């Protein structure tokens, strides 16, 4: 069974949508095998998004991701990465298909409610940033 890493971002949490997003995750057939509510420090956000450290949006992204609580998760399902990315929708909520999480709960590109790994290798690195193997059920 494939795994992926997911985040319910601070904007969705602040808007009171974390529970609605979690409900959709379960409704769509994902199994949550790891879940933590946390507030990333600026340093933790910079470490997690280090792959983007030379990009112009890096400072804004890490400031936003350390601006409030979020939920980090490890999801499991058949074809999990593609299935989760499809449920999230396009990065820009305005371009996301109706019914997708980003269309429903996101507002702008930088505050688009959710994050998801884009490949198995990325998922492995990202989930290990927040979870040890002993924490995944």
Curated annotation (Swiss-Prot):
Residues the record lists as binding ATP: 9, 57, 85, 91, 102, 112
PROSITE patterns named in the record: NDPK, NDPK_LIKE
Keywords (A to Z) from UniProt: ATP-binding, Cytoplasm, Kinase, Magnesium, Metal-binding, Nucleotide metabolism, Nucleotide-binding, Phosphoprotein, Transferase
GO CC entries: cytoplasm
Cell compartment(s), UniProt: Cytoplasm
EC code: 2.7.4.6
Endpoints of the signal sequence: none
Broad class of where this protein is predominantly found: cytoplasm
Domain of life per record: Bacteria
Annotated active site: 115
GO molecular function, one term: ATP binding
Pfam families per UniProt: NDK (PF00334)
Cofactor entry: Mg(2+)
Primary enzyme class: transferase
Gene3D superfamilies: Nucleoside diphosphate kinase-like domain
Gene Ontology biological-process entries: CTP biosynthetic process; GTP biosynthetic process; UTP biosynthetic process
Reactions listed under catalytic activity: a 2'-deoxyribonucleoside 5'-diphosphate + ATP = a 2'-deoxyribonucleoside 5'-triphosphate + ADP; a ribonucleoside 5'-diphosphate + ATP = a ribonucleoside 5'-triphosphate + ADP
Known function: Major role in the synthesis of nucleoside triphosphates other than ATP. The ATP gamma phosphate is transferred to the NDP beta phosphate via a ping-pong mechanism, using a phosphorylated active-site intermediate.
HAMAP family in the record: NDP_kinase
UniProt subunit comment: Homotetramer.
Family membership noted in the UniProt record: Belongs to the NDK family.
Name assigned to this protein: Nucleoside diphosphate kinase
Organism of provenance: Desulfotalea psychrophila (strain LSv54 / DSM 12343)
Gene transcribed to yield this protein: ndk
């Amino acid at each position: 069974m494939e795994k992926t890493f997911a985040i319910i971002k601070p904007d969705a949490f602040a808007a009171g949508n974390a529970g609605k997003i979690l409900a959709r995750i379960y409704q769509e057939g994902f199994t949550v095998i790891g879940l933590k509510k946390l507030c990333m420090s600026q340093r933790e956000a910079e470490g997690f998004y280090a792959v983007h450290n030379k990009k112009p949006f890096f400072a804004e992204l890490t400031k936003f991701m350390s601006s409030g609580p979020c939920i980090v998760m490890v999801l499991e399902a058949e074809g999990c990465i593609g299935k989760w990315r499809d449920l999230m929708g396009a990065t820009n909520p305005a371009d996301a298909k109706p019914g997708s999480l980003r269309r429903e709960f996101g507002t702008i590109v930088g505050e688009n409610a959710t994050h998801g790994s884009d490949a198995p290798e990325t998922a492995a690195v990202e989930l290990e940033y927040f979870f040890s193997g002993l924490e995944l059920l």
